[in-house]
Amino acid sequence: MTDLIQWPKAAYWSRTFNPWIGCKKVSPACDNCYARAIMRRFCPNTSSTQLLRAHALENSFTPRQSAQRRPPKSGVVFCGNMTDLWGDWVPLPEAYVVRTSQCKKGVYLYLTKRFDRMCKGMRNIPEDIYKYYLSNHYFGFTAENQEWYEKRLKLREVSDFSWPDWANLWVSCEPLLGPIDLGLMFDGEVVKPKYSWVVVGAESGPKRRECKIEWIESIVEQCKAAGVPVFVKQICLPSGRFTNKIDEFPEHLRIRQVPWGNHGK
C-alpha cells in the first residue's frame, strides 16, 4: 500500500467522470440524494429518464470521434458521482473501467449501491488489465447501516466472486444512518472483509437524518484496529449542528486518510 497521507479537504476527489447522469432509488441512502437535488435545481422540467437518455454515451472501444466523454487523465477522479455506473441502465459498466485503466497518472474511484452487479461485471475485465493496470483503481460500495451493509455483501453474485488480494476495495459509510459492525457472520464464523479504505460521514442537507457521533467513533476504532485507512468526511456535533470543517471535529475524529499517497496529485 502507498504511504498514507492526510487529505486536506472534505471532498476526497478532485475531478469527476460522468458518462451517465441520473439514477434510480434502491435503498434508504438514496432518499436525500444530492445528485437528484442538483438535477432538480438546474433541470426542473426534465425527468430522470429524459436525462438518462440525453446523456447516455456509447460504450464502444473503437477509437473514433463521438460525443463520448473521456475520463480525466490525472487527479483523483470520482467515476459516476452523478449516477451509479453499475445500475442496470448502463449496458457495459466494466467498459469504463477498461477505459480508465489506460490512465496511469490518476486515481479512479468507483462507488455503487449495486455491488452485486459490480462483482458480476468485473468478471468480464480482461485478465491482463485486471492484473497489471488497476493498481490505481478503487472499487467500493455504499453501506448506510448494518442491514444494507450485510445485504450488499451477502448477495450471491458478491459471495461467489473472489476479488484478488491486491484489489483495492473500499466502503463508503455515507450517509451513515445507523451503527455498522464491519465484520460479517458466514456459516457461524465472523469474517472481516479486507478493505483498502473506509469513508464515513453524516448525511448533509436540510433533510439530513440522525447520525450519532458514537456510530462514527465505532467505525474509526474498527478501522484503526484492522489497520485500514479511514476518512471522516463530515459529522453532526453533539449540539446537532452539521459540519465538514475538520478543525471543528473532536480531536480524535480529525482523520482524513487516503491510501494512494501523493498519486493523483
PLM segments and residue spans:
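C-terminal accessory extensions appended to soluble enzyme cores
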Residues: 237-265
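Conserved AdoMet/S-adenosylmethionine-binding subsite of the radical SAM
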Residues: 60-231
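N-terminal [4Fe-4S]-dependent radical SAM core
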Residues: 1-77
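A C-terminal junction/extension of Radical SAM enzymes
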Residues: 2-4, 227, 232-234, 238-239
